[in-house]
């Protein structure tokens, strides 16, 4: 045995229980603001309870989990933590609505080497704001202080969301057919995808992130939070027969649109129907990125692609615009030959 008779504590090992408790106290108000009537009890229990909304006749649960990728590294480098939580919620809830799901509740996981209560509280405040935008309850979470696993006060976040959809209203792409219209819903920027390439472009171009682009710094463009499409899309679904929705995330157009198309169908996208937001033009120029690679990595200004009957396209666009979205006719669905690519950008 060692001759050192001093008594060791968890804090000596790098885990500050008092800091964790202080964080819980700080975020109670955030959690309360996201409350839904289905939630039973508050935070602090071993598990969180939530009943199903009574309006559903045959409720089907839909779930999703995600992170924010290396956008988090950029946020840490710029010491801006108040919006990354919105990104986290958005990446989860936007995946739920593509199947028609209404988000019910959200849980987060925050892991760090050394807990900075102010930073963590700022992140959770963003998560709360995201939940408010999505209409779901922040029902619980986990804060893990793990010395030796992360460098200093670096941290990572992950989210998990559960929603509900009426069985008869599940959107699975099976109704997609030639002649359907494709509606685009605009993004707020790169959202939370492609940031390893973004950071590489910043490195090789030696970019000054304080440089202004259309009245905003590059840093602000790149850290603009991911749009949350829940309320506007659910509103549109009340009046329109949506056949499919694609959330344009990692893999861009080429990877995400085919995920919701049946065999034998392809999306014909009119590349002249919109102008890329300035940040994407900057990324392409600063990194000398080929157009194909841009569409494979970034959303290029399109956050959602919605397929529905041509006769309902104008109505859908009007509803989305009334809900504050930038929406337009993006293209149409056509028949695809065997072995043909399922996305064509003209």
Curated annotation (Swiss-Prot):
GO terms for biological process: 'de novo' IMP biosynthetic process; adenine biosynthetic process. Its main location: cytoplasm. One of its GO terms (cellular component) is cytosol. InterPro entries: PurM-like_C_dom, PurM-like_C_sf, PurM-like_N, PurM-like_N_sf, PurM_cligase. It is found in: Cytoplasm. Pfam families: AIRS (PF00586), AIRS_C (PF02769). SUPFAM superfamilies: PurM C-terminal domain-like, PurM N-terminal domain-like. The keyword Hydrolase does not apply. Its EC number is 6.3.3.1. Pathway: Purine metabolism; IMP biosynthesis via de novo pathway; 5-amino-1-(5-phospho-D-ribosyl)imidazole from N(2)-formyl-N(1)-(5-phospho-D-ribosyl)glycinamide: step 2/2. Keywords: ATP-binding, Cytoplasm, Ligase, Nucleotide-binding, Purine biosynthesis. Belongs to the AIR synthase family. This is Phosphoribosylformylglycinamidine cyclo-ligase. It comes from Photobacterium profundum (strain SS9). The lineage of its organism: Bacteria, Pseudomonadati, Pseudomonadota, Gammaproteobacteria, Vibrionales.
């Amino acid at each position: 045995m060692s001759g050192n008779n001093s008594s060791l504590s968890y804090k000596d090992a790098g885990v500050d229980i008092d800091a964790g408790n202080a964080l819980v106290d700080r975020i109670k108000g955030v959690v309360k603001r996201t409350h839904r009537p289905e939630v039973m009890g508050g935070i602090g229990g071993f598990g969180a309870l939530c009943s199903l909304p009574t309006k559903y006749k045959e409720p089907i649960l839909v779930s999703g989990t995600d992170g924010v990728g290396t956008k988090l590294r950029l946020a840490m480098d710029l010491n801006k933590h108040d919006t990354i939580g919105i990104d986290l919620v958005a990446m989860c809830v936007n995946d739920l609505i593509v199947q028609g799901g209404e988000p019910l509740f959200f849980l987060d996981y925050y892991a760090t080497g050394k807990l900075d209560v102010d930073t963590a509280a700022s992140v959770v405040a963003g998560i709360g704001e995201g939940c408010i935008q999505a209409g779901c309850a922040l029902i619980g979470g986990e804060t893990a202080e793990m010395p030796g696993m992360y460098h200093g006060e670096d941290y990572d976040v992950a989210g998990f969301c559960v929603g509900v959809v009426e069985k008869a209203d599940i959107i699975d792409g099976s109704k997609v057919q030639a002649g359907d219209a494709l509606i685009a819903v605009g993004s707020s920027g790169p959202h939370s995808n492609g940031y390893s390439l973004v950071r590489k472009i910043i490195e090789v171009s030696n970019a000054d992130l304080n440089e202004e682009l259309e009245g905003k710094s590059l840093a602000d463009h790149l850290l603009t939070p991911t749009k949350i499409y829940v309320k506007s899309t659910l509103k549109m679904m009340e009046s329109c027969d949506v056949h499919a929705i694609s959330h344009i995330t990692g893999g861009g157009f080429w990877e995400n649109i085919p995920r919701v198309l049946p065999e034998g169908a392809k999306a014909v996208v009119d590349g002249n129907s919109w102008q890329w937001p300035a940040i994407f033009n900057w990324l392409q120029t600063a990194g000398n990125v080929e157009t194909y690679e841009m569409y494979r990595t970034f959303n290029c200004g399109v956050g959602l692609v919605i397929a529905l009957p041509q006769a309902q396209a104008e109505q859908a666009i009007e509803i989305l615009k009334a809900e504050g979205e930038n929406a337009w006719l993006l293209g149409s669905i056509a028949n695809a030959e065997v072995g043909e690519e399922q996305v064509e950008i003209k």
